Structure formats: C-alpha cells, structure tokens
Swiss-Prot record:
Tissues and organs where the protein is expressed, per its UniProt entry: Expressed by the venom gland.
A Pfam family assignment: Toxin_20
Origin species: Cyriopagopus hainanus (Chinese bird spider)
InterPro entries, per the entry: Hwtx-2-like (IPR012625)
Purpose of the protein: Neurotoxin active on both insects and mammals.
Alphabetic keyword roster: Disulfide bond, Neurotoxin, Postsynaptic neurotoxin, Secreted, Signal, Toxin
A GO CC term assigned to this protein in UniProt: host cell postsynaptic membrane
Family named by the database record: Belongs to the neurotoxin 12 (Hwtx-2) family. 02 (Hwtx-2) subfamily.
Acyltransferase listed as a keyword: no
Entry-linked SUPFAM superfamilies: omega toxin-like
KW Lipid metabolism (keyword) present: no
Name of the protein in question: U4-theraphotoxin-Hhn1a
C-alpha cells in the first residue's frame, strides 16, 4: 500500500514538473516569435554602444568632463558604453 502511494505521488510530482517546464518553453517560444530577431537586437546594441562612446569622446576632447549621454529604453551609459539597467 505504501509503495503504491509513493509511486502515485512520485508520478504526480513528475507530471507537475514536466507541465511547468513545458509551459515555460512555450512562453519563451512565444516571446521569441513576437520580439525582434537576434541579429536586429545585436545591431541595436552596437548602435547604442557606438553612440554613447562617441558622445563621451567628443566631450572629453573639448576639455570638459565627460557628461554621459542618456541612453533610452532601459539602458544606462557606464564607462563609455550603454549597458542594460
């Protein structure tokens, strides 16, 4: 009787874990379909990095303290680079 109960509980736990993992994979796949492709995201990241570093270099050449350009959309300028906040 105890063995049967343990087997049933084990199967139920495995089923719950499997269902949770399947839901997470499905959510990830939907996010990937809705979002931009990785190549476009990489291009956006490179543009942000370039804009921020160029802005700081221009200000340094003018004998002024580097006041970092504000990066938009959840990005922050640190060490002449835009980084995600």
């Amino acid at each position: 009787m105890k063995v049967t109960l343990i087997a049933i509980l084990t199967c139920a736990a495995v089923l719950v874990l499997h269902t949770t993992a399947a839901e997470e994979l499905e959510a990830e796949s939907q996010l990937m379909e809705v979002g931009m492709p990785d190549t476009e995201l990489a291009a956006v990241d490179e543009e942000r990095l370039f804009e921020c570093s160029v802005s700081c270099e221009i200000e340094k050449e003018g004998n002024k303290d580097c006041k970092k350009k504000k990066c938009k959309g959840g990005w922050k300028c640190k060490f002449n680079m835009c980084v995600k906040v």
